[in-house]
Amino acid sequence: MYVIEEKDEQSPVDSNGRRWRCDEYSEWEVGPCLVLHEPEPRALLVQPVEQEEIIERKGLIEEVDAIAAAIDVPFAVAFISIADWNQQLSPWQAPAVFGKADFGAGARETLQHIENLLPELKRRYDLSADAPVLLGGYSLAALFSLWSAYESHSFHAIAAASPSVWFPGWLDYAKVHHPQADIIYLSLGDREDKTRNPIMRTVSICIQEQHALLQTEPILKTTLAWNPGNHFQHPEQRCAKGFIWCMEQLLLG
């Protein structure tokens, strides 16, 4: 069994009349992990985030606050710190699209680490073995979450906010694979395609094609939400909207 060590238990966080514990783990196989949890949680949300977000914390707490305002069911959220997004979240190697850093192929290792962590998180926070697990994220973390839906049976729902579906080779992959998750949320800003980058400019076309592919899958519940603004506006709120929709579908199911 995977064991989490070096917990730094923080003061309780009050949110919408609900009290949360905030636990920080300084080291695990990928990096630091921040867990916000209520007593007797019934669902586990997992989200890869940048290291700076773990340190700053304010935006993550605001995201949890938004989810808690909409969902009455108690839950736990594990924010997983990712040091090198281009390496650790990319499903395969690809040349740089912006900046100088090429994309690596570390997504499979990151997925394996997260899957290894799930049983210990459920044990530590008193979640039942069959409690639903939701994976989500923003930008490349959203693409990683979407890719994980195709590669793993570990997740009941995927919240992919502004996923990098322009990623080289992604749609070719999605056309010949089938997602294992039953619920997939997609969203995009309505101005995300307003960019000079010729590859990223295709994102609106790509997200619509991705959504159309998901709509052909039997049983799968999916939606595509359009948010006002470009890629860099309100990421926490957009992630919260995705998790809320996924939780609502699970509760309805």
Go through each PLM region and give its residues.
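A conserved amphipathic alpha-helix that caps or lines the catalytic cleft of carbohydrate-
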Residues: 64-65, 148-149, 211
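The conserved beta1-alpha1 loop
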Residues: 46-50, 162, 188
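Gly/Ala-rich beta-loop-alpha elbow adjacent to hydrolase catalytic centers
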Residues: 136-141, 145
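A domain-start/cap signature at the N-terminus of enzymes
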Residues: 1-43, 75
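Short beta-strand immediately N-terminal to the catalytic nucleophile in serine-hydrolase-like folds
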Residues: 132-137, 161
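Serine-hydrolase catalytic machinery in alpha/beta-hydrolase-like enzymes
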Residues: 39-116, 120-126
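Conserved hydrolase catalytic core segment
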Residues: 147-157
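The feature captures the conserved acid-bearing segment of alpha/beta-hydrolase catalytic domains
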Residues: 164-246
